[in-house]
Amino acid sequence: MNVVVVGATGRTGSEIVAEASERGHDVSGVARSQTSVGDVRVYPTEEFPELLDNADAVIDFTVPEATREHVQAAAAAGVPYVIGTTGFDDDGMAALRTASESTAVLKASNFARGVQALLRVVEAGVEALPEYDIELTETHHNGKRDAPSGTANTILDVVDETRDEALDRTHGREGEHRRGDDEVGVHVRRAGTVRGEHELLLAGNDEVLSLTHRAESRRVFAAGAVDAAEWLADRSAGWYDFEDTV
């Protein structure tokens, strides 16, 4: 399979290049300027449309502005597109949805298999303990731009869907006020080189249930992204998420 990795020189992008190469795929990279990642050639952004001529799938872990531009080109060429970029506004998400009308687009906030399991456990826990207070803490490296993380927002969406109501999301706390009954606390930490950690706390009278996922390496995200690309390559135009591949 011919795979184009957009953001090939980034933290996760370079891991995706390595993972896809080790699986025997033909890999080309895209970045701001021409370079290489190991034995894989990385082309400047302006050459991306030409790479689509022979591509079976694109994997993109960059920033919303770049992803939006590249997915439009891929849609025009009919090349399936895997998106790990987070932090899109409503207009950005609408653009991705529009692209999915012309090609297969798979977007996920997290490509770790363990996170998919966590989401199912979160649903079960929230359903079983409907009166418990809920707090979410997420930690990432000091270079991560969006907060809360895309994974944190996905977890919170699962909580809302399971509770069948939109809880008030309180981002951090200060001052003096009582915790609301329909409130979920959201706490963000950015420090060092932490790959990603998410903890959902369900607290009742005299007991606490803590649900945690911790990524030990970015390779887990890379493996999931390549899994997604392999699965997506033969799909028809439409909108998909990582859960569809499980």
UniProtKB/Swiss-Prot annotation:
It holds the Pfam family DapB_N. This is 4-hydroxy-tetrahydrodipicolinate reductase. GO terms for biological process: diaminopimelate biosynthetic process; lysine biosynthetic process via diaminopimelate. Keywords: Amino-acid biosynthesis, Cytoplasm, Diaminopimelate biosynthesis, Lysine biosynthesis, NAD, NADP, Oxidoreductase. It catalyses: (S)-2,3,4,5-tetrahydrodipicolinate + NAD(+) + H2O = (2S,4S)-4-hydroxy-2,3,4,5-tetrahydrodipicolinate + NADH + H(+); (S)-2,3,4,5-tetrahydrodipicolinate + NADP(+) + H2O = (2S,4S)-4-hydroxy-2,3,4,5-tetrahydrodipicolinate + NADPH + H(+). Coiled coil: none annotated. It is an enzyme of class 1 (oxidoreductase). (S)-2,3,4,5-tetrahydrodipicolinate binds at residues 141, 150-151. GO terms for cellular component: cytoplasm.
